């Protein structure tokens, strides 16, 4: 983690690929570790809006607990411990979740710092909307992100029953804008936001304002294949190029479409990339390739 100014690192949304990477790294680094102590800083605002427990003493319940297993789905990571306790992390719209071998690499600021009995640490600082919650097994059932991400809605990565036939069935069940089908409360998959959406529809050659009811079977196939390819590429590349993993290392995935293409030409056809406000965010696309 040397040389990285964490305080100035750009906030970036965390989607399914980055969540999977974090969960795997947390498993490698924290499994079986026992919590010695915790510290909370600058948490009042997050507590008021529900991003952290309203009672700071709720985190005391984690002291003395050992990490049993880590599960993840969508944008949510659930660190399960003994004594029926959990630390629920959902970095959704930006968070620095970092592992430290000793106190020498601890950042100046954090929202939650967890110290383990072996002298290692986990620090979390939310840089956007997200969740850092201490919860019993029973309490975890009622947490919004748990209900949202650990639901019947399929994950586009890591689940064998998410086939093209299943994807087509979900798309056909209700005609809606293509963005609403990929991102948000009515999405047919979990774990994706505007960043992944822009890449997926660009690679699939689909205009951002299309309705799912107008898609041909070939276009649905392209959408399904593009989703798989983009997400797996991000996982293999260690996440987005402007995102930091658990060890403070930046990802290497450069988006094929998004804000990085501002004032650029399409690498496939040479047309000027355009931007529109759509579905609660800015969407970049190629007006020639995406129809």
Go through each PLM region and give its residues.
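Short, amphipathic alpha-helical segments
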Residues: 104-108, 161, 172, 191
């Amino acid at each position: 983690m040397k040389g990285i100014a964490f305080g100035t690192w750009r906030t970036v949304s965390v989607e399914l690929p980055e969540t999977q990477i974090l969960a795997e790294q947390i498993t490698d680094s924290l499994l079986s570790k026992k919590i010695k102590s915790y510290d909370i800083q600058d948490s009042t605002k997050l507590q008021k809006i529900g991003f952290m427990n309203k009672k700071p003493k709720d985190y005391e319940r984690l002291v003395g607990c050992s990490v049993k297993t880590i599960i993840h789905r969508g944008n949510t990571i659930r660190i399960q411990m003994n004594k029926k306790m959990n630390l629920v992390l959902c970095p959704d719209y930006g968070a620095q979740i970092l592992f430290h071998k000793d106190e020498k690499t601890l950042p100046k600021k954090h929202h939650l710092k967890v110290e383990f009995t072996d002298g290692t640490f986990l620090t979390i600082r939310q840089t956007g909307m997200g969740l850092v919650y201490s919860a019993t097994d029973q309490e975890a059932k009622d947490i919004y992100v748990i209900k949202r991400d650990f639901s019947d809605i399929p994950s586009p990565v890591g689940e064998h029953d998410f086939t093209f036939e299943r994807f087509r069935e979900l798309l056909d069940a209700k005609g809606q804008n293509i963005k609403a089908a990929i991102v948000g409360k009515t999405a047919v998959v979990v774990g994706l936001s505007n960043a992944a959406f822009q890449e997926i529809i660009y690679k699939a050659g689909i205009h951002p304002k299309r309705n799912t009811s107008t898609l041909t079977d070939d276009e649905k196939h392209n959408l399904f294949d593009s989703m798989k390819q983009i997400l797996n590429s991000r996982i293999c590349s260690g996440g987005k190029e402007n995102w930091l993993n658990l060890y403070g290392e930046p990802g290497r995935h450069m988006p094929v479409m998004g804000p990085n293409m501002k004032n650029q030409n399409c690498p496939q056809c040479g047309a000027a990339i355009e931007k529109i406000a759509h579905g609660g965010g800015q969407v970049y696309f190629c007006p020639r390739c995406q129809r």
